[in-house]
Amino acid sequence: MARYTGPATRKSRRLRVDLVGGDMAFERRPYPPGQAGRARIKESEYLLQLQEKQKARFIYGVMEKQFRRYYAEANRRAGKTGENLVVLLESRLDNVVYRAGLANTRRQARQLVSHGHFTVNGKAIDVPSFRVSQYDIINVREKSQKMNWFEEAQDNLVDAVVPAWLQVVPENLRILVHQLPERAQIDIPLQEQLIVEFYSK
């Protein structure tokens, strides 16, 4: 599956948001790259909408074609299209693994899922974009639990703060999906209405 593998810090600086999580290089220089990076320029409405779309894409690690499919589905659903879009993105398996504290970044979570370390309701899943549902049970596969990474993660899970819509059982390396998230429970710096306006043109 195609994915962006370029320099994350440069993208973070361009979009003015930490796309990685704990990116010290971005914190030191949170302005766009280039000699004129520090200068303030007047941004057009279109540019603001485009940047917000790109921000969402890179936060969740989604390529353009796949992002369009997410938007199309969000638009078909009842309710606010922008909020539907964010909920769909947040419901990806790789994001759930990240939110549960089993990975330090979404990129790392995507890699762990791709390598087949998880099951959902007892079935092995290696597709990062797999969409979780309410009452799903996600486990680290038994043979993967002995890996150093998961042993260390297990210790850290005891004090981990996870979203209210998830529950983590550290001793079993298990994630329970109590419900799908609501927009108010998703703490990402995103103005999704700008994305709706971008695709509505």
UniProtKB/Swiss-Prot annotation:
GO CC terms: small ribosomal subunit
UniProt cross-references to InterPro entries, sorted A to Z: Ribosomal_uS4 (IPR022801), Ribosomal_uS4_bac-type (IPR005709), Ribosomal_uS4_CS (IPR018079), Ribosomal_uS4_N (IPR001912), S4_RNA-bd (IPR002942), S4_RNA-bd_sf (IPR036986)
Matches recorded under PROSITE patterns: RIBOSOMAL_S4, S4
Entry's Gene Ontology BP terms: ribosomal small subunit biogenesis; translation
Annotated keywords: Ribonucleoprotein, Ribosomal protein, RNA-binding, rRNA-binding
GO MF annotations in UniProt: rRNA binding; structural constituent of ribosome
Family: Belongs to the universal ribosomal protein uS4 family.
This protein's name: Small ribosomal subunit protein uS4
Species assigned in the record: Corynebacterium glutamicum (strain R)
Gene name for this UniProt entry: rpsD
